Amino acid sequence: MGTSVTFFVSPLMRSEAMEREVQAIDSEFNTHLQDDFSRLGQLQGHTSSPGHPFNRFSCGNKKSLDDAKDNGINLQERILKLYRDYYHGGLMKLVVIGGESLNVLEHWVLELFGDVKKGPQVKLEFKTEGPIWKAGRLYRLEAVDDVHILHLAWTLPCLQEHYLKKLEGCLCHVLGHEGRGSLYSYLKARGWIRSLDASLSRIDCSSVAYIFCMVIYLTDSGLEKIFEIIGFVYQYIELLRPMLPQEWIFRELHDVGNMKFIFAEEQDQDDYASGLAENLLCYATQHVIYGDYVNESWDKELIEYVLGFFRPENMRIDVISNSLFKTKGQLGYVVLCGWTHTCKVFGFYFCVQVQTHPPSKQTGKLYSGLTV
């Protein structure tokens, strides 16, 4: 602790150290470019609405930092300003795990961290108006791996104040279900998909929005049936609307969460301390340890409200495939701007296409094999 606390009290921020860090950032950026989901994250930020906070939340590289300097921005001054504005006790959380007594640990913390600058106890929130992405767009991204991925994303309101209800966990459970009568089992039986996962990770949760994602790994034949698959996604959602919420699902998830907490395996202490510090930013103090597992209250109206955001006009479609050139003229979309080569910034190809009619109108009648 004695070594790390120096950074928060009196960081050096030497220019030569910053140059080395720029090289490290660029190396990390280039490594991420070999990962399909890192590419997708870059593309989603790049194609979000100008001026929206999401448009700025992406990895930098040497070029982006050099461009900033060429535009008269002093990076060292900006970093020092960031430190002065945000690195103070009012915004920071500390977790210490050790074998010593609590009195000894508290003494060490007060002695070592007592010189950290004090500041107001505030909770930073980013608020914005308007959608993250334009509606009716399909983005095709050239894949690194030999895969075909259909990635669907819906923008939900911030649900942080409802963390005790774990609403998102209920939706992930139902939409990602793999049993008989599920969306997965139906698409799998048709030979269109290899896997289906519905999720909402912590990195997708902010005061701006929660991003609910469905990641579908496609077969070769499934790549040619993208819009039929999307149609069945909405058929399944329509089946859920009158049937959800069902309290027995919540009770089941509540019991599973309790068992996971009671029988949780011991974590590496570094990871555990880091996770608890992060939880201090998200949960009330009494829920810091249990907050990731808790399903405390049942809210029928809230689930119905959030389901209302699962609409075609609130959906972003990304297709990640190494067969991009073969599929760019698929039914329902026309090329809006052709191929856009962004190698100077990102180093990969993507194509934007505009919708000519909503995918939900291609679905036909509800298929009787889909059940909940």
Identify what each model region corresponds to.
Residues 9, 98-100, 156-160, 216-224, ...:
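A generic structural motif
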Residues 50-65, 88, 93-159, 244-267, ...:
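An aromatic/glycine/proline-enriched structural segment found at the starts
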Residues 80-84, 138-140, 199-204, 301-307, ...:
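Generic recognition of flexible, low-complexity loop/linker segments
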Residues 83-90, 143-146, 205-210, 310:
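Short, flexible turn/loop "capping" segments at secondary-structure junctions
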Residues 91-99, 213-217, 315-318:
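Short cationic amphipathic helices and targeting signals
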Residues 150-154, 210-219:
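Short, hydrophobic beta-strand segments
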